[in-house]
Amino acid sequence: MLVSVVLNIMNEENHIADLLDSLVIQEGPIEVVVVDANSRDRTREIVERYVQQYPGLVKMYIKPGSRGLSTNFGISQAKGEIIAFTGGDCIANPFWIKELRKSVMEGNAVVAGKTINMGLKAWEELDRVELLYRGVDLSYPSCNEAFKREVLEKVGGFDTWFITAEDIDLNFRSVDAGFKIVYNPSAVIYHRTKSTLYRFYKQAFWNGAGRKQLTLKHGRLWGNYDPMRMFKQKMTFWSFTRLVVAIMGYIGFKLFDAKGPYAKKLLKAK
C-alpha cells in the first residue's frame, strides 16, 4: 500500500534536511508531499534539492494558511491509500513507515506511533496531557499518526479554523465516526523540543488557546475531565509553568477571539 507522508512546514531550514534524510530511506512504496506554508528562510531551497534528487518521491507545494488548510491541501495532492503525518522538526526512525503500514494492513484505520522528545532533558520528560473520549486518548499528536484515506474523506480532514489542537479535533471526529485509534510503540518519531524559553512558552500559550477552541466546538469533551489528574502526575517547575501559560492562552482566546464558527453552537447547547 502506498503511504503518502504529508508535511506542513514553515521556516524549518535548520531541521528539514534531517527529516527528509530520514524519510527517503523508508520502506516503500512511499511519497513525501511537502507543503510549505510560506517560509521566509531557506526551507524551500533545501526541499527543492530533495525534489531534484528524488524525483517522484519528494514533491513540494506552496500553500499559505493555517496548519489545517495547508495540510488539507497536501492531502488533496497525495496519492496514497494511507496518509501519514509528521513535523518539520522531527526525525523518523528507519522502520517508521513499515510499522505504520503494518498496523493499517492489520485492519486498523488510524494509527498513532511513539513520539520521543529530544532536547533539554527537563523538557524531554514533560508528559502529554491526556484527553479521553470513549476510552480513547485523543491527545496523540499529528507528528506521528497515519490515517486510511477513507477516514479523512469521511470526517472531512482537518478543521481549518483551529490555530492549534487541530490534530486533537481530527482524532475526536475520527473516533466519533466509529474509527478506533491504535497505538503502535514501534512506529517511532523523534521530536525536537523547543530550543528557547520564548518558544517553549509560546507553544504552551497557543496550546492553551487550542484547548479553548476545542471547548467551543466540543464542549462535551470536558464533561468527565478531572483537572486534578495533572497535579497527581509528576509536577515539576516546567510542567507547572507550562500549565500556567497554557491557562493564560485558554483565557486569552476566550476573552479576545472566541467569536469563531462554533461560539453560537455552544451557546445554543447550554
Give, region by region, the residue ranges found by the protein language model:
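Short, acidic, metal-binding catalytic loop of nucleotide-sugar glycosyltransferases
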Residues: 21-30
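A conserved acidic beta->alpha catalytic loop
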Residues: 36-45, 90
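Short aromatic/hydrophobic "clamp" motif used to bind/position activated sugar donors
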Residues: 83
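Conserved donor NDP-sugar-binding/catalytic core segment of glycosyltransferases
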Residues: 94-123
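A recurrent flexible, glycine/aromatic-enriched loop bordering the glycosyltransferase active site
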Residues: 117-118, 130-147, 163, 169
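A short, conserved alpha-helix in the catalytic core of glycosyltransferases
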Residues: 144-145, 151-156, 161-188
